[in-house]
């Protein structure tokens, strides 16, 4: 592989033959002399990340006070405020295509008709607890129905007992009936973020804003928050409407196609951008109304409002729109604890703290496989510990974010530690991005078991993932991963972005998947890579592409992946490393085009990546185990791929 525009290797590929003469001592070495002075061994340098005064250790230490014992030792039982348990009945999914509409855990039960709404009692107990100086609001064992958001207040620990399930109303109207902002026909809404863009929208089932010292806790996996996002609230049969219908995936969860109201349908309630942003320039208006990203769709309209500089108070969604709320969303809060409970059937992202400082999430099971059901998405937060979580998700297990488009007012996501977690299924095990406009820095991860438990039917797509594009921009700095075990590998099937790539781009689907030639490439960036750097994430989905991303100082060590056999394929992944740097073609802003930085400063060491399906030599028609485009030095040290040892540097100048 000597082509400058494929992968430039410098260094050595080491096999067992290289070690053939090293079985004994050196015949020319001087004999030891009895009684001679022995030089002192050099001191072992302290681990700068996990050592006693390491960066990650200091973050963990700074969060030692975020515990349940920090709350006043006074309980407020919700039954004392009028809460009543509800009967539960069996529920059968109306959706018959289980390939497109798989049944999520917890979807087989729902409160019986006429169930008592305990939400007023929950809110009354929270208010009393906070007013008295704080304590613990306790929901006892049993099943409870809640028709709207549980809004936490300062100094309150909202606690689910063992064998306690709160079933939230599946009806979107219940999350727009009494929020703090009266938005007329759109309902009474909540300040929120949807895919890292600020807006007024449906309230999250568990919500807080500008609160201090709050906790959501339980006693293990039987303490359950069930969002009932798969439970229909209208219609019947295969066209019944539930929260997940709003994704707009044809044939999935009641979506019959483009005419079904969803985030991806032409919404007549979205007014022309010149009306809502009268000062918009003609150049910006042209970009935002490009038919490739139809502005009338809610999923494109909100980013367009951000790019046009429309104030958040005028970005009104809720009723008449189709942007799903997160399950747990805390905004602008300090000292946040989420511990020892179980989420199921969530409308959107399962946990979304935004602009929060001092966040601990520990022992939580994120267990929902619907569309966009990420497990934990801290957004522009500072000082975060994610410890001992278990993930079974419909999207990324962990995705660290920091705003999108012009919504980067909260700055970077920084000082995060992720440790001791298990990833059973999902798109990415640990992901940075894609919404990372404010940047991401100082992220430390260790001891992750990416079990990929359902590898035969619902495989983990990627283990370690960075994703951004010319719209998201931002930066990744100081990302350290140490110790990832993948006993069942990741997806053996590669996957690219197809129609989400830009027409005319050198990155396009006419190139065989996983191949980079001197002039074109097609990364397997959506699935199949153990480690994926993707700086060209679905570029056709964004109208504005003017912000190149910077990825630098990434260190990954001690990753071990084992092979599995699925059908005729045996392997640990499709490709071991997928490194797609920024693509200059994507830029669509004013001239001149800014500098387009390559991925730089990456070290991968002491890893055994098993055997990729694409294990053979790379060519212009056949993928090899490594894909690289616009990369300035990925150093491999003691990295084994398909039995071959790599000590080399990967470079691909563009």
Where do the model's predicted regions map?
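Right-handed parallel beta-helix
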Residues: 162-163, 212-223, 334-344, 357-368, ...
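Glycine-centered low-complexity coil/loop motifs and glycine-rich tracts
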Residues: 23-26, 434-436, 467-475, 497, ...
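Predominantly polar beta-repeat domains that present long G/T/S/D/N-rich surfaces used to bind, process
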Residues: 567-574, 579-580, 587-654
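Active-site proximal loops enriched in glycine and acidic residues that flank catalytic Cys/His/Asp
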Residues: 380, 402, 432-434, 466-470, ...
